[in-house]
Amino acid sequence: MTPEEEAAILDAALTRDTLAHAMQVARFLESPAPAAAWRWIDTFLEAFAGECPTVREALPIVADLRAEAVIVPAIDLEKLRNRQVVFFLDAVSQYVDDQRELRGLPVSRDVLEIAKEFGLKSDEAHWCVRVALTGKSTGCPFELLFPLLGHDRIMMRIGAISSHLLHGRGLEPIPYGPGGVPFKTIEGTKPT
């Protein structure tokens, strides 16, 4: 493929067909694309078409979603270093494992119900799950993110975070954060 041909693919407007073709060229997708891949592409477009006008902007997001691991900023990882958070993330992983299909589930609502069992506030619960799954604090709704990641990636990413938190220093948080400010992890309260 010439550089001009590659540029034409990357600079194409983001559509179902242009994304599928670019994913095949980047070896993220086999050819011909199976029906499940077209559903994945449709979900991706629903989640990200507004922020990705071209294939060039979409492919790094596709790569992040297809990766088996995620890089979590150190300070965010420290915020997760708490027993309730580790158990909460494990419960979310079990919830995912129990689902036959991740499409069409009220994931945001279900995550909040799980969070209540561990005394976590709703905004903190969503933040914990999003950071564990993407390494970022914002993104598309869980109802779209979960099907894009799929069962295996969700469980691998949560498992990796839990393993990292439980080994090494364990659940002992750092005493001070940036600028010497006393550091606090996300903590649950006693469920009512």
Regions found by a protein language model. Give the residues of each.
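Charged substrate- and nucleic-acid-binding regions of tRNA-handling and nucleotidyl-transfer enzymes
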Residues: G104-P173
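Small-residue-rich helix-loop
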Residues: T2-F118, G177, K184, G188
